A protein has these predicted regions:
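Structural motif corresponding to the early beta-alpha repeats
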Residues: 31-120, 124, 128-132, 172, ...
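Glycine-/small-residue-rich active-site loops that bind phosphorylated ligands and cofactors
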Residues: 13-14, 79, 109-111, 140-144
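Active-site-proximal beta-strand/loop segments in catalytic clefts of secreted hydrolases
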Residues: 11, 105, 136-138
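Histidine-acidic metal/acid-base catalytic patches
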Residues: 1-10, 14-32, 59, 63, ...
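Aromatic-lined carbohydrate-recognition surfaces of secreted/lumenal glycan-active proteins
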Residues: 134-142, 168
Length: 292
C-alpha cells in the first residue's frame, strides 16, 4: 500500500494569508494542505480568486513550502444555473495546484434536476483533468441530495460515473442529522457505511452542547474519530483533518464565525495534537490488521 496522505485543511487558518498557513503547517510537520474556499466558512472571495495567475502564485507558494496539495475544498450547490462555469474554473485552479480530489456539496433537493444535468458535464471535465469530484455531506441541517450515507450511495448509483465519489465528513453529520432526532444517524457508523464509496474523507471532531456545536482537536469531541481512523487504515483512502476553530454552529446548525482569527499558537497546538492522534490510531489499526 502506498504511503497514506494525511492532509490538514486550511480552514482553521481562516483570516491568514496562504504563505502564513503553509509556514505554520510546515512547523507542525505537516506534509500536505487542503486549501479551503467555502462561502460563509472562510474569508469572503469571488471567482477572481481562481484565475490562472492566482493558481500560478499558489503553486509557487506550495513549491517553496515543500508541502503538497492532494485535495481541495470549494463547496457550491452543483444544481445552480451557473455551476458548470463556476465549478469548472475551480477545478482547473485545483488541478494546477496538483489536487487529485476536489470536494464540494451536492445540491439542495430543490435543485435536483439542475444537479443531474450539471454533474454530467462536470464529471467529464474531472476525467479530462485526472481528478475526482468528492461530494460532501453538509452540516447546516438543510435538505440536501446527500444528507446521510444512504443518500450519498444512492446518488452515486444514479450518477454512474467513477469520477464522482463521496467525501464523507462525520463532523458535519452530528449537526446536520443529529442522532437524537427523526432521520438522525450515528456519525461514525454512517461514516463507515459511506467509506467504500469514498474517494476521500474528512476527519473532524465536534462537541455537541445545548448552545450549539463546537469544533475540537481530534479525541476531544463526541465523534468516534478513532473508529473512523481504524476503519480507514484498512483502505487506501487519503484523508484530511479539518478543524475550523474560528467557527461554531448554533443549535440550528448554522455556522457562526468569530470576529478575529484564531491565534497561530492555538492552531499549531491543536493541529499537532490531532495529527498525532490520527497517526497513532492509523498505525495501531494497521498493526492489528497486518496492513503494511
Amino acid at each position: 500500500m502506498a504511503q497514506r496522505i494525511v492532509s490538514i485543511s486550511a480552514a482553521p487558518y481562516d483570516g491568514y494569508a496562504f504563505p502564513q498557513v503553509l509556514d505554520s503547517l510546515a512547523a507542525c510537520g505537516v506534509s500536505h494542505v487542503e486549501p479551503a474556499f467555502i462561502v460563509g466558512y472562510t474569508e469572503p472571495f469571488d471567482e477572481s480568486a481562481f484565475t490562472p495567475g492566482e493558481a500560478q502564485q499558489y503553486a509557487k507558494w506550495l513549491s517553496a513550502s515543500g508541502l503538497g496539495c492532494y485535495a481541495f475544498s470549494s463547496h457550491i450547490d452543483l444544481g445552480r444555473h451557473d455551476a458548470v462555469s463556476v465549478f469548472c474554473g475551480r477545478m482547473d485552479f485545483a488541478a494546477r495546484l496538483g489536487a487529485k480530489v476536489i470536494n464540494t456539496n451536492a445540491a439542495a433537493r430543490r435543485n435536483e434536476a439542475g444537479f443531474f444535468n450539471n454533474i454530467k458535464v462536470l464529471a467529464r471535465h474531472a476525467e479530462q483533468l485526472g481528478m475526482i469530484i468528492g461530494l460532501e455531506n453538509p452540516g447546516d441541517g438543510s435538505d440536501n441530495l446527500f444528507n446521510t450515507a444512504q443518500d450519498g450511495i444512492a446518488l452515486l448509483d444514479a450518477i454512474g460515473n467513477t469520477n464522482v465519489r463521496l467525501n464523507y465528513d462525520a463532523g458535519n453529520t452530528i449537526s446536520h442529522r443529529p442522532q437524537s432526532r427523526d432521520g438522525g444517524v450515528n456519525p461514525a457508523a454512517d461514516a463507515l457505511l459511506a467509506m467504500p464509496h469514498c474517494a476521500y474523507t474528512h476527519i473532524k471532531d465536534v462537541r455537541a452542547a445545548a448552545d450549539g456545536y463546537f469544533f475540537t482537536p481530534l479525541g476531544h469531541g463526541d465523534i468516534d474519530c478513532a473508529a473512523i481512523l481504524r476503519a480507514l487504515a484498512a483502505t487506501d483512502l487519503n484523508c484530511s483533518i479539518e478543524m475550523p476553530l474560528r467557527l461554531h454552529r448554533a443549535p440550528n446548525a448554522q455556522p457562526q464565525r468569530k470576529p478575529e482569527p484564531v491565534p497561530r499558537a492555538v492552531l499549531e497546538a491543536a493541529i499537532s495534537e490531532s495529527l498525532a492522534f490520527a497517526c497513532r490510531h492509523l498505525e495501531i489499526a494497521s498493526l492489528t490488521q497486518g496492513v503494511a
